[in-house]
């Protein structure tokens, strides 16, 4: 809103306080700041792929006003060719795109002169205060529709149009109507189809990826001003996408924003409890956790062959979803089931309840029903690095065979100095017949933020793409939230707070080898049965099981996503 003139006048009401010389230092400094701001805006527009300068935005806004007015007043016949014959592929070149659109429309009422349709705009063409940043839209149109491989931006010609007033308070912009009605609003009464301006979806997708990468690069170089501007544009560009791309971009945008504004996600007991619940939904939606449990159980079952007393120490107890299948397999074992002891380790509950005990009670009921001798004990630990072998009530290996199991847990130790070495030391004291490990197949633990960001963007884009084939349900939505929390931790956090430090099989193999473990190859039965399991999900389409040096990898198309490996103490130990 304009201030009254007397607010800027001195006591004599005739001399301006700040207006005696245009070459004063204050004015010069203001001009310099404006030039720097324009350069920053030009940089941002260039990064996003728009071939236009900030100084040209006023004229672009003028053309957008003309285009909106023409489309609002054109008849159905005058726009039909846009919906059928004309496709505009590159709105990044705003000048040529707008000129092309204005030429294609060519309304019958148009006269010579670029602003003949709206003479009020001509009268105020040099008044840049008429145009503000809020008047501009990166992509024109009021609605977004998905059509094959393109995005269709629809303009509803049957809706009411309100044209902006000029800078003069007494002049109103009007549009001619068949009834000759003059006023601030014009209502189109003709019924028409929605004419479409089609934009290549790949163009928008590429621009979105470029914006994500540019923002991550700005964060790494500590250019937070540019990063802040880019993260806002990422959210805007993401809504023009559909499916997995929109969801992934939204989660990465949130994570980048948290890093920029130093709003680290919480790492509390409530957060642990929520992650546990979300993991259950993830288990129901897609085959990744089922594959992890099945392949690990198969390796444990083979290692327990012929043993009368067996003991599993689970580093990732959670809701105990892995163990009913193993207990049923033991119950069906030739010669009768062995005595089965289970030690479950998990984080503390938010309400201080003994949730591990509740899980044990449910498993005990199952064991009784299938006639398996069962013993259970749960341990609460904030970190696996807090464990000590003496807590586990180990029995002589001659009387009891022990297996250690870890699913998506070991990578959380890599941010704690000496954490993984401490756990490996405890496992060697346990002397298990097998140590089964499931981890994400990706390197998200490098020292360079931009490299981690790039790898995680590829990895989670593939994961979200695999979820698109699942039926829409609450489980699917919660599964996406589960993955989104991982993205947030990976991108927004550093130091001990960043626990999502995934590494590849080759990296883990080096760690295990240097710590005194040797690989225990998974059998062919696990490979065949895992392939059968995947057929239950989307007909198995897209999922692949691959064998890699005795380990099993679950891939979506050609990208490995998780790996199951098994280890035993090397001969020298």
UniProtKB/Swiss-Prot annotation:
This is DELLA protein RGA1. The keyword Isomerase does not apply. Residues 206-260 are annotated as: Leucine repeat I (LRI). The gene is RGA1. Residues 199-568 form the GRAS domain. The DELLA motif is required for its GA-induced degradation. Transmembrane segments: none annotated. The keyword Flavoprotein does not apply. Changing residue 328 to R: In brrga1-1; causes a dwarf phenotype due to its inability to be degraded. It comes from Brassica campestris. A motif (LXXLL motif) lies at residues 410-414. Residues 402-489 are annotated as: PFYRE. A motif (DELLA motif) lies at residues 42-46. A motif (VHIID) lies at residues 310-314. Phosphorylated. Keywords: Gibberellin signaling pathway, Nucleus, Phosphoprotein, Repressor, Transcription, Transcription regulation, Ubl conjugation. Residues 279-344 are annotated as: VHIID. It is found in: Nucleus. Belongs to the GRAS family. DELLA subfamily. Residues 1-25, 158-179 are annotated as: Disordered. Residues 358-390 are annotated as: Leucine repeat II (LRII). One of its GO terms (molecular function) is DNA-binding transcription factor activity.
């Amino acid at each position: 809103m304009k201030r009254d003139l007397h607010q800027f006048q001195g006591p004599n009401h005739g001399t301006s306080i700040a207006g005696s010389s245009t070459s004063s230092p204050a004015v010069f400094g203001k001009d310099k700041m404006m030039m720097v701001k324009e350069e920053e805006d030009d940089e941002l527009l260039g990064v996003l792929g728009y071939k236009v300068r900030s100084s040209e935005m006023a004229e672009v806004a003028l053309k957008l006003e003309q285009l909106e007015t023409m489309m609002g007043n054109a008849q159905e016949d005058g726009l039909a060719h846009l919906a059928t014959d004309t496709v505009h592929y590159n709105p990044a070149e705003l000048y040529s795109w707008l000129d092309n659109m204005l030429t294609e429309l060519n309304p019958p009422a148009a006269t010579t002169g670029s602003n003949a349709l709206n003479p009020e705009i001509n009268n105020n063409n040099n008044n840049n205060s008429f145009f503000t940043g809020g008047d501009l839209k990166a992509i024109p149109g009021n609605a977004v529709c998905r059509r094959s491989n393109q995005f269709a931006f629809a303009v509803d010609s049957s809706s009411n149009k309100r044209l902006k007033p000029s800078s003069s308070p007494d002049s109103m912009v009007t549009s001619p109507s068949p009834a000759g009605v003059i006023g601030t609003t014009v209502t189109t009464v003709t019924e028409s189809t929605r004419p479409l301006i089609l934009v290549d979806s790949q163009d928008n997708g590429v621009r979105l990826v470029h914006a994500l990468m540019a923002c991550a690069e700005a964060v790494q170089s500590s250019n937070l001003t540019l990063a802040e501007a880019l993260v806002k544009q990422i959210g805007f560009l993401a809504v023009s996408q559909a499916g997995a791309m929109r969801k992934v971009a939204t989660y990465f945008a949130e994570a980048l924003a948290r890093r920029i504004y130093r709003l680290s996600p919480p790492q509390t007991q409530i957060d642990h409890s929520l992650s546990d619940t979300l993991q259950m939904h993830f288990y129901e939606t897609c085959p990744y956790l089922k594959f992890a449990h099945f392949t690990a159980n198969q390796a444990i079952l083979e290692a327990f062959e012929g043993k009368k007393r067996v003991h599993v120490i689970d580093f990732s107890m959670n809701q105990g979803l892995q163990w009913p299948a193993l207990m049923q397999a033991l119950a069906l074992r030739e010669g009768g089931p062995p005595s089965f002891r289970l030690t479950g380790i998990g984080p503390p509950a938010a309400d201080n309840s003994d949730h591990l005990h509740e899980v044990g009670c449910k498993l005990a009921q199952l064991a009784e029903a299938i006639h398996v001798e069962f013993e259970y004990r749960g341990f609460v630990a904030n970190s696996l690095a807090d464990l000590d072998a003496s807590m586990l009530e180990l029995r002589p290996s001659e009387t009891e065979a022990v297996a250690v199991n870890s699913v998506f847990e070991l990578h959380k130790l890599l941010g704690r100095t000496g954490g993984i070495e401490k756990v490996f030391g405890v496992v060697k004291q346990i002397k298990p017949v097998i140590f089964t490990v499931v981890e994400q197949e990706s390197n998200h633990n490098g020292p360079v933020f931009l490299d981690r960001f790039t790898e995680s963007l590829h990895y989670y884009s593939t994961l979200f793409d695999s979820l698109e084939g699942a039926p829409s349900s609450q489980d699917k939505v919660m599964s996406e939230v589960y993955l989104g929390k991982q993205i947030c931790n990976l991108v927004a956090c550093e130091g001990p707070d960043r626990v999502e430090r995934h590494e590849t099989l080759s990296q883990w193999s080096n760690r295990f080898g240097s710590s005194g473990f040797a690989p225990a190859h998974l059998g062919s039965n696990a490979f065949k049965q895992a392939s059968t399991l995947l057929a239950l999900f989307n007909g198995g389409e897209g999922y692949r099981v691959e064998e890699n040096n005795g380990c099993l990898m679950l891939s979506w198309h050609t990208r490995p996503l998780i790996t199951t490996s098994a280890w035993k103490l090397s001969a020298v130990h």
